[in-house]
Regions:
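Membrane-embedded alpha-helical bundles of polytopic integral membrane proteins
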Residues: 2-260
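Interfacial loop-to-transmembrane junctions
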Residues: 276-297
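Re-entrant/interfacial helical elements at transmembrane boundaries that shape
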Residues: 205-209, 273-276, 299, 303-304
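Short, conserved aromatic-histidine micro-motifs
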Residues: 250, 295, 314-315
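Juxtamembrane boundary at the C-terminal end of a transmembrane helix
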Residues: 175, 308-316
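Final/C-terminal transmembrane alpha-helix of multipass membrane proteins
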Residues: 294-311
Length: 316
């Protein structure tokens, strides 16, 4: 346990060092290239750095607090993300009981089952039980106008914001031989690799981006940015093998999988935003829009990462 805490502290301090360096670079760029705030690229970069400071502090404190801190943090994230998602849906008064059940019954039960390490139930609770419960509650109100669209939106919200997101702290429940009491480092690995991929795709795209991947969905995403960001994040993931139960090659392969899932997850969530006619999911995090804007890549990659690790490395 002491080794795990020591590795975690080393990792957190390293991230703080990187953020300090990034903040200094951002300050210099602001003074030289955007003293009046007119350079959108520089201002966007500094907004991202400020948001990263806030997120890293919260995540770092949760990690150091242990299992309870991590589960509470992601339960809060699920609640906030679910609120953002539901705000953009077509729900009506007839759906209020279903929504109340989603927030105050389904979400708490999912995280309680995770806390109790009941994999057999929490792995199917939302996609089976909650999936069937939501339309039952709504149909009892008797309003059938746009019923399929309304209930599908609620089901999608639960799948993304609760089910997928809960697979991040679910990594704490895995029983990996020789890796006891170190599972929090798996979460650190997942979040760092996926989030760095997002940042590096942005940087590579700004420096070398020419060919847009999906102009209507996300104009800032380019082939060059995608390739450079994914490749860089994969190499960084391989270099972080020492905090995982993986070999460098395995860490690199898993990093490639989760960065690809994160990228496509971002595209899917961008498509939903465009369908709703909005630029961001919310304004909770300055410089990053809503919580979903920041975590979309993580929640898409988390279930894949969890099940790959559980199948190949875990005893349970």
């Amino acid at each position: 346990m002491n080794d795990a805490r020591s590795d975690l502290i080393t990792l957190v301090l390293s991230i703080f060092a990187v953020l300090i360096f990034a903040s200094l670079v951002g300050y210099v760029l602001h003074r030289r290239l955007s003293p009046d705030g007119s350079n959108s690229a520089v201002e966007n970069l500094n907004a991202r750095i400020k948001a990263w400071w806030i997120m890293v502090i919260f995540i770092g404190v949760a990690f150091l607090a242990g299992r309870a801190g991590v589960i509470i943090l992601f339960a809060f994230c699920s609640f906030a993300a679910l609120r953002e998602f539901i705000t953009l849906t077509n729900t009506k008064r007839a759906d209020h009981w279903a929504l109340a059940s989603a927030f105050f019954v389904v979400l708490p039960i999912q995280y309680y089952l995770l806390w109790a390490e009941e994999y057999g139930i929490y792995s199917i609770f939302v996609p089976v039980y909650a999936f069937l419960l939501m339309p039952i509650i709504s149909v009892l109100r008797g309003d059938t106008e746009r019923f399929l669209i309304r209930i599908a939106e609620v089901q999608w919200a639960l799948m993304i914001c609760v089910f997928c997101a809960s697979h991040v702290p679910a990594l704490l429940t895995l029983n990996i031989p020789g890796y006891e009491d170190r599972n929090v480092l798996l979460i650190a690995f997942l979040v760092i690799v996926v989030q760095l991929s997002d940042v590096l795709q942005y940087v590579w795209g700004k420096l070398f981006g020419r060919t847009k991947i999906a102009p209507k969905l996300s104009p800032s995403k380019t082939v060059e940015g995608f390739a450079g960001g994914v490749a860089s994040a994969t190499l960084i993931g391989a270099s972080l093998w020492w905090i995982t139960p993986f070999t460098p090659l395995q860490a690199g392969m898993l990093s490639l999988v989760i960065t690809l899932m994160g990228f496509f997850g971002g595209l899917v969530m961008s498509a939903i935003k465009r369908d709703r006619g909005v630029k961001d999911w919310g304004n909770l995090i300055e410089g990053h829009g809503g919580l979903i804007d920041r975590l979309d890549s993580v929640v898409f990659s988390a279930p894949i990462f969890f099940h790959l690790v559980r199948y190949w490395w875990s005893l349970t």
